[in-house]
UniProtKB/Swiss-Prot annotation:
Pfam families: Coprogen_oxidas. This is Oxygen-dependent coproporphyrinogen-III oxidase. It is an enzyme of class 1 (oxidoreductase). Involved in the heme biosynthesis. Catalyzes the aerobic oxidative decarboxylation of propionate groups of rings A and B of coproporphyrinogen-III to yield the vinyl groups in protoporphyrinogen-IX. InterPro entries: Coprogen_oxidase_aer, Coprogen_oxidase_aer_sf, Coprogen_oxidase_CS. It comes from Leishmania major. Homodimer.
Amino acid sequence: MSLAVEAVKDFLLKLQDDICEALEAEDGQATFVEDKWTREGGGGGRTRVMVDGAVIEKGGVNFSHVYGKGLPMSSTERHPDIAGCNFEAMGVSLVIHPKNPHVPTSHANVRLFVAEREGKEPVWWFGGGFDLTPYYAVEEDCRDFHQVAQDLCKPFGADVYARFKGWCDEYFFIPYRNEARGIGGLFFDDLNEWPFEKCFEFVQAVGKGYMDAYIPIVNRRKNTPYTEQQVEFQEFRRGRYAEFNLVIDRGTKFGLQSGGRTESILISLPPRARWGYNWQPEPGTPEARLTEYFLTKRQWV
């Protein structure tokens, strides 16, 4: 079986370009700085970073394409049959941390993984999704975000949105805090239940859907006035974001264990965060409502 790996790579490179262009237009001040890198074991990538923009305080949009021999533990613990195989992994991953606490943080990722087995068909799967982490959440934004997610899933099956929305709720959860990281979206991994071409079509829809879901929210909220107290709450919630990425996220573990580029992997961390001992928001405030209402498993559409 011949996989259209080059077509996937071309799509990912263009997706990185398109997302950076859309975010630069929304910021209106800062631009992404590109840092090309190579991986000693094979492959490389393009890291693009925006800092101190008018809207985006820190944003990273990464493309990577790495290959080599011998898979890291984070892959083989779920796929022991491919331990020691040659592998190829490529993807676009991004996290956007806006300056204004009324603009949510967003994350998106689309990727392809291929493992070559001698004398056998290659093992392949796609993964990815997108999700939203608001600080001062607005119901309209949450509904619209999930509506885009639901609409892009419909052509691929009646149950696809519900499955991948549920998976997102489960994955982006901090068990030791008993808190969700955000209001969810879509998450999928090990996607090979359809033919390669159909899986690739779905991944393309997810990549483009991220922009349709997120950019309008940025546009609506970026000029909302905010206070220093609200920035402090944003930084407190960013602490939770950092915890998830460092302690739980499989992508971070895979990148670090496979000898990936540390600066690119940790670009998802916020520029500033805070931790307070046993800090709790005042009852009845928007800060309390975030965890009590928005960060619970809800059917938004």
